[in-house]
Amino acid sequence: MKYAIIAAGEGSRLAEEGISVPKPLVKVAGQCLVDRLIRVFMANDAEEIVVVCNDLTPLVDEHLRMIERDGFEGRMIPLRHIVRTTPSSMHSFYELSEFLKDSPFVLTTVDTIFRDEEFADYIAAFKASLADGSADGMMGVTDYVDDEKPLYVTPLPVPPRGEAGECQFPLIGNFLDADPDGVCPYISGGIYGLTPKAIDTLNRCMAEGKSRMRNFQRGLIEDGLRLLAFPFSKVLDIDHAKDVEKAEEFLRTRPLTRPSGTLSPRGEGKVSTSNQEK
């Protein structure tokens, strides 16, 4: 499995709140955000990890060069990175796309926080969907709302016969900016399991002058790609200084139950002032 990390954001809100290091090097539970993802990806059969970082500071570039040269946690890492400063996360994805055209991959932003064991379950489910041909992608979703501008996920009521088959994870019908009636069961978690088909959609979105990952996700639906929803108990972002403590507390606690593949109305979530795009 290939993995890709978008680490090209400015992290301006963290800087304004007194965190001086670039976001990819912010530590959660004693580990830099980018290192945490590398560790998790290596634990889930990473064939290659590609990262895009910006050129606003040399620190992230230098850190990734060191890992490429010296390895990480006692072993060499199949890591490559590029340095680009881009106007949106979709543009960052586009810069990575040349490395993602020949096999399935999982993409996320550098500050996405989830439980390791849930991610392992997600990867197993994504691989199973690829093996049986039930989907063109699997998106991580959550019913925990901690985002000022969440992207709501609407499932299809009944998976089309012969497409999703017996798969326990429902197909996604659309991605919406608003859910005034509270009927959408989940929001996007910013974890994207995709096949090379998605690159065609990305290229179309770029040609049409679109930006933001949410518009790319809607483009996938417009192009007829079959996307399954995999529920995580929580997915958090590190956008503010207080989010570091929140993430560490989340990782310390254990869930009472694992979410199932059946989508139901959202649970009670705490709405923050984050505007991390999904």
Task: Locate each region found by the language model.
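Conserved donor-nucleotide/metal-binding helix-loop-beta segment in metal-dependent transferases, i.e.
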Residues: 117-149
